[in-house]
Amino acid sequence: MTESLKITDLHVSVADKPILRGVNLELRRGETHALMGPNGSGKSTLGYAIMGHPGYEITSGSITLNGQDLLAMEPNDRAKAGVFLAFQRPMSIPGVKVSDFLRHATTNVRRPDRKEGEELIPMREFRKELKEKMEQLRIDPEFARRYVNDGFSGGEMKRAEILQMAMLRPKFAILDETDSGLDVDAVRLASQSIAEIGGAEMGILIITHHDKLLEHNTPDYTHVMLGGRIVETGGPELAAELHQRGYDRIRAAYPEAAAEEAAMQRDGKKLQAVG
């Protein structure tokens, strides 16, 4: 049986405001899915909910990983089980080298029963694999000696996330706006890198609002999110249509979701004004 990450009728609130309103999606290993939609439609909320961010309250619905209840797992256990999220805005960790961070993260994922203080992956083995992955992704060796995201450009942050994904080898990877803030060349490089480390063993959900990141990652399925729900699913041609024509047809076809989208945007502006 093919392994899968299955989301069923998922409802999520943030600060008591409903964001996701019944999301259904199943991602199987070896598949690439694109989740597209206007800004503020709830795309990133789905990624955070999958990984168990405490600020995102799941009010109903389920997420299962190969039939197991993912929502019953702590966030670190979800990562150990093979689920990975590349953040839209990853945090910096001054004083912690990329190589040290990756060695700890890789050890914890590959040895899920390891306790704090127990030995890490042997240094020689780790360095060999890290060197191979960095060469594959065309990343300068000096990168591993820098502090995690400290002073990184937007492109460097995204490459650090992709390198982490390459080392952890998750079963399922959620890439949240990996193309955000990148120029055309950086997006193309990120797209190529994702394609190189994905393959038949990894299910990938690419969260984006345009199709540039899909240049080397043709989606098996394209989902459109509007007003906190997936309103339409198609193939790669749907992603191309959205890139060329925008979301006017989608809003006209799903007026209830469009009204919810407008309300969500108004609520978002009110929260920003208060903050």
Could you describe each region identified by the protein language model?
Residues 5-7, 20-22:
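Conserved structural motif at the start of ABC-family nucleotide-binding domains
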Residues 174-178, 185:
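Walker B catalytic motif
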Residues 91-171:
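ABC-family P-loop ATPase nucleotide-binding domains
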Residues 187-200:
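Helical segment within the ABC ATPase nucleotide-binding domain
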Residues 62-78, 149:
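ABC ATPase NBD Q-loop/coupling interface
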